[in-house]
Amino acid sequence: MSKKIVLLPGDGIGPEIVAEAKKVLEAVDAKFKLGLKFEEDLIGGCAIDVHGVPLAQSTLDRCKAADAVLMGSVGGPKWDALDSNIRPEKGLLKIRYEMGLYANLRPAILYPQLADASSLKPEIVSGLDILIVRELTGGIYFGEPRGIRLLDNGERQGYNTYVYAEHEIERIGRTAFEMAMKRDKKVCSVDKANVLEATVLWREVIQSISKDYPEVELSHMYVDNAAMQLVRAPKQFDVVVTGNMFGDILSDTAAMLTGSIGMLPSASLNQDSKGLYEPVHGSAPDIAGQGVANPLATILSAAMMLRYSLNEAAAADAIEAAVGAVLDDGLRSADIFSEGMKKVSTQEMGDAVAAKI
């Protein structure tokens, strides 16, 4: 039975890195007989140029009908002056919301071959393997009312609403505990329950879920302390679960512990484990078309796609092992290059990973 994957290369370096991920997926498809079928469509700035909107309804329908979606990146200075309602990034927010992608999985793994790339001492980060589980469709980014209003005294006031319903906390919490069961069985829930009522409820719901997972050790941490601990002693964490805004900030902090954002994949899943997979890094318009972008985050996102949406763990393992083997061989893209290594292009890196499979 075939599995349909929609590719959304997007803007900037997106088309280059998605092309390499597709190449690697074709290699595992040939080896494991997965029956992968690919369709390609537009999102972001390139969709605005063609359709006048960052995500056409036809594209959204195609994504909803697929088994999984693999995206490159969206945005660039060309579209920065547009009204905020039709900016490239709105296409990504819409696809997350319309597909019900409430769980964002952000691994922060330090490859031993790249230990020197981290800004922290090797003894602090070596062996780092954190999974941040971020709630993606609720919280202050989606809460209503929101806006900018004119007060009676003539002053303008900006306002947003931080809101979470029990069911939203429940489902992201269960996702985190399920992930922890497959890892080191530790969950740290991050909130600001000493100040925000919405996160008082968050803490209560997470605590009650933990009763269903007695093997998993649960801890709670205020977000300011969590940010400090991520830098001070990151290896204390296994799975971190948190709301939309806190997760947005903490996952980028965790990303830089690894030394290169060009290595980090992500997954966004819905109730049915259908998902959108994308690298953590942006569209990098300054290097687009030069063949120097690191495709490994997108390739590793493809591995996550095989694992979480297509239930093809062996194929996912094969991709991750191939990435490790290529790094062992000393091949490096520009962003992770160091003295004594061999600098390779985007395409050469993709070729090397595919060849290892």
Swiss-Prot record:
GO BP terms in the entry: L-leucine biosynthetic process
Record text on subunit structure and interactions: Homodimer.
Localization per Swiss-Prot or TrEMBL: Cytoplasm
Listed InterPro entries: IsoCit/isopropylmalate_DH_CS (IPR019818), IsoPropMal-DH-like_dom (IPR024084), Isopropylmalate_DH (IPR004429)
Major enzyme class: oxidoreductase
Source species: Saccharophagus degradans (strain 2-40 / ATCC 43961 / DSM 17024)
Designated name of the protein: 3-isopropylmalate dehydrogenase
Family: Belongs to the isocitrate and isopropylmalate dehydrogenases family. LeuB type 1 subfamily.
SMART domains for this protein: Iso_dh
Residues binding Mg(2+), per UniProt: 224, 248, 252
Oxidoreductase is among the record's keywords: yes
Signal peptide span: none
Catalytic activity, reaction form: (2R,3S)-3-isopropylmalate + NAD(+) = 4-methyl-2-oxopentanoate + CO2 + NADH
An annotated GO cellular component: cytosol
Alphabetically ordered keywords of this record: Amino-acid biosynthesis, Branched-chain amino acid biosynthesis, Cytoplasm, Leucine biosynthesis, Magnesium, Manganese, Metal-binding, NAD, Oxidoreductase
Pathway given in the UniProt record: Amino-acid biosynthesis; L-leucine biosynthesis; L-leucine from 3-methyl-2-oxobutanoate: step 3/4
Gene name of this polypeptide: leuB
Function description: Catalyzes the oxidation of 3-carboxy-2-hydroxy-4-methylpentanoate (3-isopropylmalate) to 3-carboxy-4-methyl-2-oxopentanoate. The product decarboxylates to 4-methyl-2 oxopentanoate.
Primary location class: cytoplasm
MF annotations from Gene Ontology: 3-isopropylmalate dehydrogenase activity; magnesium ion binding; NAD binding
NCBIfam families tied to this protein: leuB
Record: residues binding NAD(+): 76-89, 282-294
Annotated site, Important for catalysis, chain positions: 141, 192
E.C. no: 1.1.1.85
Cofactor(s) needed by this chain: Mg(2+); Mn(2+)
Chain sites annotated for binding substrate: 96, 106, 134, 224
One Pfam family recorded for the sequence: Iso_dh
Gene3D superfamilies: Isopropylmalate Dehydrogenase
